[in-house]
Amino acid sequence: MKRIDPIPKNLSPDALLRSLGITEPRDIDVEAIAYYVGLRVKRRCLKCCEAMITGLGNKGIISVNPVVMPQRERFSIAQELGHWAHHRGETVACRATDIGKFSKTNNVERAADQYAADLLMPWSMFRIECR
């Protein structure tokens, strides 16, 4: 798999999946997608959150807490991909106490959450599975 270098900012989840030729939900591998867009996934103990992303230019690292359930880990990686797609180059810090409050940080988290949902359950595939 060849990396996109650099990945366009605000690339939609559907466009990203299409560029990878992914047409089946079972083929959505968030770690492979992360690698494709210039990110590495590392598991390490995090005290204040379940996942975080740090980057410079077009490369970065998603750190994810290894003690969470696999489904939560998958969503956390997808959510950090949302930050990469929408907020790359910005300094954004979110604490656990920020979640659920109306603030600029909350809007940033909502955008990343929506990106993760659209990446993991793209409507084009999800609607077929629902029939």
PLM feature segments, named:
Residues 1-131:
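Active-site hotspot residues in diverse enzymes, especially metal/ion-binding acidic/histidine motifs
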